[in-house]
Amino acid sequence: MKADEEVETPEAHRVYDMYHGYFDQLYRKDTSRWYIEIHGNADACCVHALEIATVGVDADTAKILASKLRDSLTAAGISPNELDIRIEPLNSLRFMAQGNKTKGVLHDVRRAIHIEAPSFARKERRPQYTAALLDFFRGLDSLDRANTNQDPQSTSP
């Protein structure tokens, strides 16, 4: 369902407001953190694709993220040919998290990764993909340190 097709109910607003309050308490303490969401899809167009919508990520950083994710997948025993990695702004995506970027938490963060994982990665290959994603997420800190060390004046993600 597209974001503009969703029906917003008073109960949904109440739950979201409560969630956003907790989010604010955590995120506002350290806005240098990456915000990460993991979702799943079963869309036929993305059967063998891991799509990553982003916030605050330029093309150079997206290339680094894609490379680090491929390395993490390989380390977890997943063939690079098993999955097509699509990441904004380098690739077009089916799932762009547009509603979340417009009205959700992604609207309020400096940097974010919103992952849409295909069904087989969440079911048949769950242990391998879980290990790969954990390794990838741990590597985000080293990416930040590398960017900080290269250019202390940099304001890019």
Label each PLM-derived region with a short phrase:
Residues 1-157:
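N-terminal catalytic or cofactor-binding beta/alpha core of small enzyme domains
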